[in-house]
Amino acid sequence: MKLIVFGATGGTGRQVVVQALEEGHEVTVVVRKPEAFDLRHDKLEVVKGDVLLPATFRQTMSGKDAALSALGVSHRNPTTVYSAGTANVMEAMRAAGVRRLICLSSAGLDFPSEMPLLQRLVIRLVI
């Protein structure tokens, strides 16, 4: 399959890319800083882009079989990348005719010390 991956510079996203390449898939990663993405492979294409700026990756979506999102967020601005970024990815998918989207996250596995205790407890119970 021809895959496009968002969030490839994080731990979860990088593992997604590694496993996809091991399975023989062609993988395109969209990253803000391509020079910081050190993984290399014959079936890997690294493209500069930002999920908050859809024009930077819209063309790259063409011809892909599926999109995978392992987007992570900072605790200072926790929803913008997930909500606006994923909406931008989905819009680019619609325009390119890509019908499969897989979203995964490590959210809930690590809690910042500044998160209120009650919030941490509720999340632990749910997850």
Predicted regions and their residues:
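Residues at the starts of beta-strands that form the adenosine-phosphate
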Residues: 2, 26-28, 99-100
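N-terminal Rossmann NAD(P)H-binding glycine-rich loop of SDR-like oxidoreductase domains
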Residues: 3-25
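N-terminal Rossmann-fold cofactor-binding loop
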Residues: 30-35, 50-51
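NAD(P)-cofactor binding segment of oxidoreductase domains
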Residues: 74-103
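Conserved catalytic-site region of short-chain dehydrogenase/reductase
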Residues: 108-113
